[in-house]
Amino acid sequence: MSSKPTQAFSLKTRQAVDEDALLTEEDRVVKEATKGEDCTTRRRACKNCTCGRAELERKMLAEGKKVEMPQMPAGGCGNCAKGDAFRCATCPFLGQPAFDNTSDGKVKLNLTDDI
């Protein structure tokens, strides 16, 4: 089975459309990929840390200083309490369960039996 390249056709003129003519200069600019994960939302540096946090922690431990956990920033989208399905990509609460927004991020478990 051979695969032929597909062509786009105009519905009005039934002529082949030049796909390169549809792109603007802004579309042609190669955008730099954003880093998906980093150490800012974790208690310790990642195993494969590339941001420099692992070196900083080792240096502080060698000097005898306490490594302080960074403060978790409040999310800007307002959906942090709803759960991962509603959180933005940079949410500091990714991976954590949904919580009641009025209880300072503490998780309330419903331990009652539903039978």
From Swiss-Prot:
Keywords noted in UniProt: 2Fe-2S, 4Fe-4S, Cytoplasm, Iron, Iron-sulfur, Metal-binding, Mitochondrion
Q: Where is this region: Disordered?
A: 30-115
Query: GO molecular-function annotation terms?
Result: 2 iron, 2 sulfur cluster binding; 4 iron, 4 sulfur cluster binding; metal ion binding
Q: Which domain of life is it from?
A: Eukaryota
Q: Where in the cell is it found?
A: Cytoplasm; Mitochondrion intermembrane space
Residues that, per the record, bind [4Fe-4S] cluster: C77, C80, C88, C91
Main location as per UniProt: cytoplasm
At which positions is [2Fe-2S] cluster bound? C39, C46, C49, C51
GO cellular component entries: mitochondrial intermembrane space
Q: Which GO terms describe its biological process?
A: iron-sulfur cluster assembly
Does the keyword Iron-sulfur belong to this entry? Answer: yes
Annotated segments matching region Fe-S binding site A: 39-51
Q: Where is this motif: Cx2C motif 1?
A: 77-80
Give the signal peptide, or none: none
- Cofactor(s) it depends on: [2Fe-2S] cluster; [4Fe-4S] cluster
List the residue ranges of the region (Fe-S binding site B): 77-91
What stretch of residues is annotated with the motif Cx2C motif 2?
A: 88-91
Purpose of the protein: Component of the cytosolic iron-sulfur (Fe-S) protein assembly (CIA) machinery. Required for the maturation of extramitochondrial Fe-S proteins. Part of an electron transfer chain functioning in an early step of cytosolic Fe-S biogenesis, facilitating the de novo assembly of a [4Fe-4S] cluster on the cytosolic Fe-S scaffold complex. Electrons are transferred from NADPH via a FAD- and FMN-containing diflavin oxidoreductase.
Q: How does it assemble?
A: Monomer.
Which family does the UniProt entry place this protein in?
A: Belongs to the anamorsin family.
Domain comment in the entry: The C-terminal domain binds 2 Fe-S clusters but is otherwise mostly in an intrinsically disordered conformation.
- Record-given protein name: Anamorsin homolog 2
